[in-house]
Amino acid sequence: MDLEKFFDTVCQSKLIEVLSRTIKDGRVISLIHKYLNAGVVANGKFERTEIEMPQGGSLSPLLSNIMLNELNKELKRRGHRFVCYADDCMIFCKSRKGAERTLKNIIPFIEGKLFLKVNRKKTEVAHISKVVNAQKRVP
């Protein structure tokens, strides 16, 4: 599963809400909010960042992991096995039908609760019927 233009679509208010659950010092939240709204210089031009998260910023990888941890917690709560790297995620299911159902059920959480967009062109259900132990093949 791929999240479409992740850094460009992170909802700042949702991120601040998630951070506020853990960070009780309003001054820290205020500093992070100012960081998110400070803007970026891209191709020699200043661009405002009023909605999204600045890509390439020093805090952005940490903040993106905090935001995506909400997805991880939800997948774990639902009992799924998964691997995520940045804005890409693989969810492992026992059957194709189960995988299709899982995808159908997790998209509303991602888009409705986290306000992120699933890239349906890059997201697919794949079925792996047999896994070969690579160590057994080594002579």
Model-assigned labels for residue ranges:
Residues 132-139:
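Short, low-order "capping/linker" segments at domain edges
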Residues 1-131:
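Conserved polymerase palm-domain catalytic core
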